[in-house]
Amino acid sequence: MKIRSSEITMSAVNKSQYPAEGIPEIALAGRSNVGKSSIINTLLNRRNFARTSQTPGKTRTINFYLINNEFYFVDLPGYGYAKIAKSEKEKWGGIMERYLESRQELCSIFLLVDIRHEPTADDKLMYEWIKHFGYNCVVIATKADKISRGQYQKHISIIRKKLQMESSEKVIPVSSLKKTGVEELWEEIVNQYNQHGYEITVD
């Protein structure tokens, strides 16, 4: 994928702040500090474009990144950080639900989980939420450089079993550090847009 332009256009907490151009979107969901910002930076080959936070749970807005003036990556607020107050968790839930239930431009959701660990109850709930709202789900298994390639299938099987994934749904191991899996991930991003009738320029 040739990246000609990329910019953050909006940080939103309610519908009135969402972009209104009708440009298609793919959203990234995952636990706090699972690596969403790092994945965005890696996909765009830009360092510190999407800011990585040292404070889990800090991102509480929906961030829209416009790529090549053709499509959006949407960075959803991280979940699962125990030290966040109950009121903040409820606020997060409202922000997420409003986006997922009403966003016609949203094509698919990519759920990020740490390949080293069994998905958490929050990951399972997020997966079920994605399916409840009728979206395709692709799982990105982050931090793939932390285990050997020979262990990939074992860990992917654990992820599939814990989330109770459909056999047709993909799990893609990705390392932001070593760029492992980035090409396959781009192919799947383009594929998801194509499935929804959008032609994305790849070169």
Curated annotation (Swiss-Prot):
Domain EngB-type G, first and last residues per copy: 22-195
InterPro entries in UniProt: G_ENGB_dom, GTP-bd, GTP-bd_ribosome_bio_YsxC, P-loop_NTPase
Lineage: superkingdom: Bacteria
Cellular component annotations (GO), alphabetically ordered: cytosol
Keyword match GTP-binding: yes
Nucleotide-binding is among the record's keywords: yes
Alphabetized UniProt keyword annotations: Cell cycle, Cell division, GTP-binding, Magnesium, Metal-binding, Nucleotide-binding, Septation
Matches recorded under Pfam families: MMR_HSR1
GO biological processes: division septum assembly
Binding site for Mg(2+): S37, T59
Cofactor: Mg(2+)
Role: Necessary for normal cell division and for the maintenance of normal septation.
The protein's name in its UniProt record: Probable GTP-binding protein EngB
Gene name for this UniProt entry: engB
